[in-house]
Design a protein with these regions (language model features):
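Outer-envelope beta-barrel architecture signal
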Residues: 16-29, 53-59, 107-113, 166-168, ...
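Membrane-embedded beta-strand positions of outer-membrane beta-barrel proteins
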Residues: 27-33, 57-61, 94, 113-117, ...
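Extracellular loop and loop/strand-boundary signature of outer-membrane beta-barrel proteins
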Residues: 30-33, 75-86, 141-148, 194-200
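Gram-negative (and chloroplast) outer-membrane scaffold detector with strong preference
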Residues: 46-137, 213
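Flexible, solvent-exposed coil segments and beta strand-coil junctions
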Residues: 20-28, 68-79, 133-143, 189-193
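Predominantly the C-terminal beta-signal and adjacent terminal strand-loop region
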Residues: 154-216
Length: 216
């Protein structure tokens, strides 16, 4: 809590010190990539508007997907199809983008700290292809099951370091989220068998992010 308060004080003090004479920093377009501990990659495009120099509000549009899965719902008669095993979703994420004034400044670059709390809204729907199989495990046909039960939203925060080479800014650091990548699947079932027990226990995820932004 003390760290958060110190960060906010630095943001407000920096905004007051700089003044509002230069509007070139008010609009920021960004492209962010992220890798997480839940074996997901994430890519998003963002726009933020800065009413004051070091605090902006905006929205991101993106997608996340698993590159490795942790559970396969299956019985002796069926199993989930290979193409349905990795979770994925498009999302919309409103967020705040906070930056400190430059802590290190040279002729070509300003370096400081940044934070971005956000609210991720995923597509509240999931669909799975079921592969039917015979007693030898060979496929005999396909079916489909879908559902919209599950926690479709998540809270997230990114904390890191930025380097501003006006008008381009690079940011990198740590990302945390309470996103459950299996949320929309846990409530699904096929022929009386629930998918939930096949998936790992719900846990928060952490990871690393890199952003390239351009100020207008």
């Amino acid at each position: 809590m003390a760290l958060a308060l110190a960060f906010m004080v630095a943001v407000v003090a920096g905004a007051a010190d700089k003044g509002q004479d230069d509007a070139a920093w008010r609009h920021c377009l960004g492209l962010t990539g992220e890798l997480t501990s839940s074996d997901t990659w994430q890519l998003e495009a963002s726009y933020h508007w800065f009413p004051v120099r070091y605090a902006g509000i905006g929205v991101s549009l993106g997608m996340w997907e698993q590159y490795s899965y942790g559970g396969v719902p299956a019985t002796n008669e069926w199993r989930t199809d290979d193409d349905s095993r990795c979770m994925m979703s498009a999302f919309l994420m409103p967020s705040l983008l906070l930056r400190t004034p430059a802590l290190i400044r040279t002729e070509s670059v300003d370096i400081g700290l940044m934070a971005e709390p956000g609210f991720m809204m995923n597509v509240p729907y999931s669909s799975v292809t079921i592969e039917m199989k015979d007693k030898w495990g060979l496929p005999t046909g396909y079916d489909r099951v879908s559902g919209n039960r599950g926690r479709w939203y998540a809270f997230s925060v990114r904390i890191g370091v930025y380097a501003a080479f006006d008008p381009v800014t690079l940011s990198l650091g740590y990302a945390w989220s309470d996103l459950d990548v299996y949320a929309m699947r846990r409530g699904m079932a096929y022929k009386g068998t629930s998918f939930g027990p096949f998936y790992p226990e719900r846990k928060n995820l952490g990871g690393a992010f890199l952003r390239v932004a351009y100020s207008l």
